[in-house]
Amino acid sequence: MARSATTADVFNAIGDANRRDILDSLIAGEKPVGAIVSDLRLSQPQVSKHLRVLSEVGLVRSRAEGRLRLYRLEVAHLQPFHDWLAKYEQAMNARLDRVDDYLRKLQHEGGPQ
């Protein structure tokens, strides 16, 4: 069954390049919106819109500090994506292992005839 694409979906949220850039920006640590705007060279309303989506799926958390709103990455909420991607990583590794085995066999036999 196909997944529905909603903004409450981690997969949909990280499907947007600007949102991935925001996540990349937050890897270094907590930042106010203005710093993210400077990092990405997007408008403040655009960044705020993307931060809202990322917050809705739990990838980003915010807290108030004085007049600033600081945002931080919630890495644990990337786990569903990591788990999904791990299946494909395992499949690719198994295929690469078979290629390695075949190449070793060819080398042992003296190469292709």
Where are these regions (language model features)?
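C-terminal regulatory/oligomerization modules of transcriptional regulators
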Residues: 1-6, 25-39, 44, 53-61, ...
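Short E/K-rich amphipathic alpha-helical oligomerization segments
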Residues: 71-75
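Conserved strand-loop elements at the edges of beta-sheets that form or border functional pockets
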Residues: 16, 62-64
